[in-house]
Amino acid sequence: MAHAIPRPAEEIPLVPGRARSVRLGSTLPRVMDCAYGSPMAVDGDVRTGGDCGGGEGLYPTSTDTAAHAVSLPRSVGEFASAVRAMSADAADALRRGAGPPPEIWPRAYRMFCELFGRYAVSPMPVFHSADPLRRAVGRYLVDLGAAPVETHAELSTRLLFCAHWCCLGHAFGCSRQAMYERECARFFEARLGIGETPPADSERYWVALLDMAGADPELFPRHAAAAAYLRTRGRKLPLPLPPQAGSATVSVASQSINF
């Protein structure tokens, strides 16, 4: 039984001057998305020839849950709600094939600067391990400026960082931490250049150290001196002369530690 051989689908180049092509039809929006410099660009790696994701993962902040929203600190609740609404508007524009609404980022930026300004000058009665991260993220967002964003990829990422800043306020009780794991890890590693994000139990670690230091202020100097002594003996280097009364000096790899 003979089968009709379908005609090959028409193909168009992805970007002028490149041999790669895609089929017309349902994939046409992806061609628009992947066009470098287009407002519909959804993949930050298009410049290097990475595959376009089609926008499926953009604007995750538009799907926040009521349970998560009420768990946020009251100081950020209004801004988090606005970010959720702006993300939904931008996602709707993406579905309609329109570029990112130009008014969204200037509005989000203005609201964030007001909120972060109050946060930055407010006293911190108790140290929280997420505070340095919040300040780093906040300063980065402030430095971006209020100019409208040209691509959906960049707008989605900025709104995600805004939501991440809010969620750092309940860093150890956030129910949507998985939303930040991939993108915000890249943020710390690439955009700020400060390495991997701290482990979730970092606060417990530092609290324990502070408690130990408070109970015995000489504990860590004694341990440091002992560690330096053992390290020096392990290298079979000559030990330094006994220090003068009232002070202790340990030489380690051409450096001196005074206690």
Curated annotation (Swiss-Prot):
The keyword Zinc applies. Signal peptide: none annotated. Its main location: virion. Induction: Expressed late in the infection cycle. One of its GO terms (cellular component) is viral tegument. A zinc finger (unnamed) spans 162-174. Keywords: Host nucleus, Late protein, Metal-binding, Virion, Virion tegument, Zinc, Zinc-finger. The keyword Chloroplast does not apply. GO terms for molecular function: zinc ion binding. Phosphorylated. InterPro entries: EHV_Unk. It is found in: Virion tegument; Host nucleus matrix. Belongs to the herpesviridae US10 family. This is Virion protein US10 homolog. It comes from Equine herpesvirus 4 (strain 1942) (EHV-4).
